[in-house]
Every structure is written in structure tokens, then in C-alpha cells.
């Protein structure tokens, strides 16, 4: 069924490559097990890596492309964390919860469809995570196909991407890890077509939590990929939130645009999480209005009264039943998907899987394990471990620039003055730092 050298299924831990030395049972997140990725002390980034340029930045800090020194010629992505701040003033109060979670989880995780952490390097007032370098991500690939004179992402490529993504997700869920921020930008793709689930900054363990997951992080998952139970204010949630996001990604790979592209309502000054009215409207327009018949638990959701109000005010514009199949058929037609086209087609099996991923009721939503056994993957020939196999086009390399404050200031790791761009300001706490 699967192509040669493709991962095989193991009931304990998911799918693993054949003959690569993985044990038959899943690597577990056992605190008694010595971490495969240790914390490196008394080593500076510039001693081991040559910085090529700047990739991106975010709330966490900055990411750089690097090449190994001392005979190690592989490429790496180095994530440099910002210090925590009190207001606008650098206080060096420690690392964020997100950074600590990402470091602790990535140090233990080991799977071919999850991004590989090489090492963690601690420097004075600065910390770096060194990852394998991936040349692409799904957002970049989707954007490439939206350009004029370009066509739909071939159906076999979509199938391989989705299989590998679910494969990595099964491994995470089997080891009690929720990702909680799956979206195209966080799904990395190597130059050889291997999928890596990346950016575990919002990930967390969900085995017997002391408090509800909501109490720790009130807002999770980027709005367009946020599951309806989260939008409805659920105080506790399950791995099903990740599967909804996979459904959104599947739809986006086919249509080349987000299926539920709503506008996010921001939290107020009291950090109260608002009802995401616009996003819920976008979902209802395609999926129909959720009722207690199709989702019995919805009536007990904190935002149920808000949903009722929304339904009453927008009643003439809402479908009472799902419009997903019409959306899907229109998507296939507009994308040129058919059995006779070069793009191929995901067919009826593709729609069935999509509808089970985008199930309103999280208790009925398909799991990663069930999805991997779905006819969409069982039928239709072998699945390639290289999602680019058979694709004649070329995707552009990831953009790497010199346009970054660290590079201009000489504080980039690998230059003479390594560390944060503001490390020279220690002792001048009144100085405010521009972002």
C-alpha cells in the first residue's frame, strides 16, 4: 500500500521509517530517560556556527540560517530568544513559559515528522535553540501556487503532505503532547520533501493536568485554524483541536486560501477573552449552524448564548445544514482537479476525510490514528515519503537577508559581540529599547 522505505505503522507510537534504527515502541517522554539533546555549557554559538543571514522574527525572538563549522557543513536554523520584559524595559527576568516548554519538549521528541532539535546553547543573558534547517514551509508553497500561470498543488503531493503531517501528529498525541498552533507556516518541508511539524512554542503535555488547559493559556491556535470548541469558550479541550487545524490546512492546500478567514477580536485591557463572532460566522457559512442534535455538548459551552444571539441576528444568511460538499466540489473544479488532469484528484475519499476532520463535535472528530487508516490513504496507490516526487516545478528557497538589527549592530551570534542587541545597556535600566 505504501511506497518503499515509507514509514510503517506501529500501534504504540505511530509510523516509523523502515530500517532507520527506531525501536518498535514509540520513544516516550519519560523524565527518567536522559535527554538525547543535552544543554551545552561554555560553548558559544560563534564557535560552532557561521551565520548566513536572517530568516524571520516573532514574539519569541529571531531566527537565523547558519552553517556548521569544524567540518560540520550542514545547514541549521538558530532561534535566538528575546529576554522577558517588564513593560518596555529590559529586566532579564528569565525565559518565557513558551520558550521553556519548547526547549523541554523538543529535547525529548524524536520522530522523522517532527522538527529536529540539534542542541541548546546558553550564553550570558541569551539562549539559542539550534534546529535542522528546512528549506520550505507550507505557507510558502501555497503562496507559490497562487501566483499567475501556476496551477493547483498536485493531489499526490497534498496526500503525501497530509499523511506525513498526521504521522507526526500521531506521535505527539501518543506521547501526550498537544501542538495547539498548527498552521501552514508551522509545517516545515525539507528540500527532499519530508514534512516536519515545527514551532512547539504553544505545545504542552496534557496527561492528567492539575488545572484545566484554559487556565494556563486562554488563547491558543491562530484564529483561522481554531476549533469551534475553543471559539465557544471550552475550559478544557483535547487533541481534537489539532485535528480541526489539520482539516483547515487540508482545505487550504486544495483551495490555496484559508477556508475560514475571519477577523480576530482582541482581548480587552482586563485580558477578557471575547467571543470570536466573526470567525464563528465564517465557519457557519460553510459548515452550517451547529445544533445540539449534531453537537450535544454545545449547550453547556460558555459562549452558547452568544452563538444563539449570532444565529438570531444573522438567521437569513446562515445555512442550517452543511455546505461543505458544495465548497469542496467548487474547489476541485476551480483548481482543475480531475481524474484526467495532471493534478489528479483527491476524489470522494478526500471529501470524506475533510468532513471528518471538520466535525463540529470534538468527541466525534476523527483522531490522527483513525485518519491515517482512512480510505483516502489506503486507496489510490503508494504514498511517497517525498512530497515533491513527480512534481516538475521548483519552489524558491527560503528568503534569507542581512536586514536585521542584530546583523547591523554586530550582536548576531557568530560576530565579535555575541548576545542580545541590548546587552550593552545593562546597568542603564532606564533606557528604553526600541523593538
Curated annotation (Swiss-Prot):
The keyword Transcription regulation is annotated on this UniProt entry: yes
Cofactor needs: Mg(2+)
Binding site for ATP: 55-63, 79
One of the record's GO cellular component terms: CKM complex
Basic and acidic residues bias: start-end ranges: 398-407
Enzyme class: transferase
Domain Protein kinase: 49-377
Keyword Electron transport recorded: no
Keywords: Activator, ATP-binding, Kinase, Magnesium, Metal-binding, Nucleotide-binding, Nucleus, Repressor, Serine/threonine-protein kinase, Transcription, Transcription regulation, Transferase
GO molecular function, one term: RNA polymerase II CTD heptapeptide repeat kinase activity
Location relative to the cell: Nucleus
Ranges for region Disordered: 398-435
EC number(s) on file: 2.7.11.22, 2.7.11.23
Active site positions, chain numbering: 181 (proton acceptor)
Catalysed reactions listed for this entry: L-seryl-[protein] + ATP = O-phospho-L-seryl-[protein] + ADP + H(+); L-threonyl-[protein] + ATP = O-phospho-L-threonyl-[protein] + ADP + H(+); [DNA-directed RNA polymerase] + ATP = phospho-[DNA-directed RNA polymerase] + ADP + H(+)
GO biological process, one term: negative regulation of filamentous growth
Family in the record: Belongs to the protein kinase superfamily. CMGC Ser/Thr protein kinase family. CDC2/CDKX subfamily.
Record text on subunit structure and interactions: Component of the srb8-11 complex, a regulatory module of the Mediator complex.
Function: Component of the srb8-11 complex. The srb8-11 complex is a regulatory module of the Mediator complex which is itself involved in regulation of basal and activated RNA polymerase II-dependent transcription. The srb8-11 complex may be involved in the transcriptional repression of a subset of genes regulated by Mediator. It may inhibit the association of the Mediator complex with RNA polymerase II to form the holoenzyme complex. The srb8-11 complex phosphorylates the C-terminal domain (CTD) of the largest subunit of RNA polymerase II.
Name used for this protein in its record: Serine/threonine-protein kinase ssn3
Amino acid at each position: 500500500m505504501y511506497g518503499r522505505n515509507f514509514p510503517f505503522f506501529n500501534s504504540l507510537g505511530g509510523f516509523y521509517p523502515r530500517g532507520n534504527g527506531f525501536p518498535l515502541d514509540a520513544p516516550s517522554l519519560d523524565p527518567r530517560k536522559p535527554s538525547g539533546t543535552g544543554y551545552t555549557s561554555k560553548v558559544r554559538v560563534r564557535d560552532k556556527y557561521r551565520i548566513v543571514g536572517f530568516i524571520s522574527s516573532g514574539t519569541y525572538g529571531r531566527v537565523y540560517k547558519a552553517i556548521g563549522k569544524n567540518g560540520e557543513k550542514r545547514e541549521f536554523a538558530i532561534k535566538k530568544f528575546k529576554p522577558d520584559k517588564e513593560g518596555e524595559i529590559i529586566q532579564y527576568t528569565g525565559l518565557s513559559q513558551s520558550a521553556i516548554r519548547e526547549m523541554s519538549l523538543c529535547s525529548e521528541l524524536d520522530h522523522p515528522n517532527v522538527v529536529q532539535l540539534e542542541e541548546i546553547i546558553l550564553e550570558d543573558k541569551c539562549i539559542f535553540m539550534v534546529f535542522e534547517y528546512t528549506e520550505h514551509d507550507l505557507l510558502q508553497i501555497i503562496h507559490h501556487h497562487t501566483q499567475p500561470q501556476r496551477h493547483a498543488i498536485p493531489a499526490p503531493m497534498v496526500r503525501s503532505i497530509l499523511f506525513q503531517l498526521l504521522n507526526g501528529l500521531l506521535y505527539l498525541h501518543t506521547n501526550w503532547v498537544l501542538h495547539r498552533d498548527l498552521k501552514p507556516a508551522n509545517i516545515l518541508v525539507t528540500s527532499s520533501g519530508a514534512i516536519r511539524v515545527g514551532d512547539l512554542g504553544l505545545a504542552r503535555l496534557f496527561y492528567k493536568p492539575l488545572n484545566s488547559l484554559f487556565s494556563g493559556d486562554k488563547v491558543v491556535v491562530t484564529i483561522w485554524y481554531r476549533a469551534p470548541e475553543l471559539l465557544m469558550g471550552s475550559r478544557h479541550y483535547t487533541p481534537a483541536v489539532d485535528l480541526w487545524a489539520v482539516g483547515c490546512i487540508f482545505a487550504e492546500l486544495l483551495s490555496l486560501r484559508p477556508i475560514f478567514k475571519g477577523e480576530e477580536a482582541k482581548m480587552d485591557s482586563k485580558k477578557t477573552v471575547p467571543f470570536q463572532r466573526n470567525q464563528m460566522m465564517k465557519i457557519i457559512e460553510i459548515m452550517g449552524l451547529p445544533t445540539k442534535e449534531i453537537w450535544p455538548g454545545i449547550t453547556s459551552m460558555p459562549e452558547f448564548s452568544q452563538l444563539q444571539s449570532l444565529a438570531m441576528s444573522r438567521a437569513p444568511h446562515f445555512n442550517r445544514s452543511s455546505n461543505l460538499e458544495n465548497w469542496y466540489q467548487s474547489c476541485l473544479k476551480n483548481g482543475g482537479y480531475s481524474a484526467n488532469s495532471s493534478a489528479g484528484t483527491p476524489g470522494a475519499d478526500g471529501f470524506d476525510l475533510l468532513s471528518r476532520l471538520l466535525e463540529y463535535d470534538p468527541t466525534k472528530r476523527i483522531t490522527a490514528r483513525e485518519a491515517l487508516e482512512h480510505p483516502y490513504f489506503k486507496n489510490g496507490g503508494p504514498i511517497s515519503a517525498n512530497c515533491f516526487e513527480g512534481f516538475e516545478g521548483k519552489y524558491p528557497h527560503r528568503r534569507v537577508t542581512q536586514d536585521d538589527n542584530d546583523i547591523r549592530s554586530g550582536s548576531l551570534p557568530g560576530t565579535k559581540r555575541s548576545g542580545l542587541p541590548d546587552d550593552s545597556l545593562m546597568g542603564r535600566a532606564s533606557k528604553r529599547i526600541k523593538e
